[in-house]
Structure formats: C-alpha cells, structure tokens
Amino acid sequence: MSRGLGDVYKRQTVEENLAIGAYSSKDKEKLKKNIEMVYDIFPRLGERREQLARTMSGGEQQMLAIGRALTLSPRLLLIDEVSMGLMPIMVNTCFKVIHDLNKNGITVLVVEQNANKALKVANRGYVLETGKIVLSDTAENLRGNNVVQNAYLGA
C-alpha cells in the first residue's frame, strides 16, 4: 500500500489501528460507535479484531485504511487508487463501500485508473492527461462519451 490511502500500522491489530485513527477524538463513546460502524461496513475486519495488520491481504489492509479514516466521521474522504493490486472481489467490495458512503452523505473524492469502476460509483468525473483536466462531466455523460469509451473503457 505504498500509494493507496495510507499505510496501516503493520505491528498493530485491527482494533488498535482503528483506535489510532481516531486518536484525537475525545468522545470515547462516539469512537466505540464509529469502530462498530466500521465493523458493520467491513464484517471481515470485525472477525479479525485481534489480527496484526501485517498478516492481512492487501484488500483487507485497504479496508482497514478506509475504516481508520471513517472513525473520525469525516464529511470528505480522499481515496487514491483504491483498486491497485487488489483481487477483483476486493475491488468490487471497495467500490460498493465508496458508493454506500456517498449515499450516506460522505463526499468521496476518488483518484482511480480503473475508469469503468470509478464512473459507475461517481456523480461526476474528470479525465486528466499530463496533469491537466481534458474532460469534465457527469459520470453518466463520460461513460457515453466516445473518446472516453475508446481510450479508457475498452470499447
């Protein structure tokens, strides 16, 4: 996870990683509720509360990194290359979570090379080339754009 959401603390357990994520929170009851919410979103993490992060798969570490960010009840979540190096089932899980978070009122900004998956969960999309925005539109319009289809969606 050298590029993703941030490294997890590999020598810490899942539970410790989540608690560290909300270290600045003074409301311990809210922290407990938020950690339980993370376990509801990612049941696999709940099953592995005492497991060291270093023994988890890349997808599980990605879930843990997202979960750690969620312990602070963010209004905005920035995610970079959520699908990089993950098994297809984990990619689907991560994008479903992103979609659900957005439906629950969290703004999620995703930087992602998997344009097909990203545009399926996005409200809006931007195409960058050499660091410059070359296309900007609703996700639906971008999915229907011939240039986007040919260059990024494999049409």
Label each PLM-derived region with a short phrase.
Residues 1-9:
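Single conserved hydrophobic/aromatic residue that forms the stacking wall/gate
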Residues 124, 136:
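Short, glycine/charged-rich "phosphate-handling" switch motifs in NTP-dependent
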Residues 69-70:
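ABC ATPase C-loop
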Residues 91-104:
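Helical segment within the ABC ATPase nucleotide-binding domain
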Residues 11-19:
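Short coil-to-helix segment of the ABC ATPase nucleotide-binding domain corresponding to the Q-loop/switch region
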Residues 52-56, 60:
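Conserved ABC ATPase signature
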Residues 73:
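Conserved catalytic motifs of ABC-family nucleotide-binding domains
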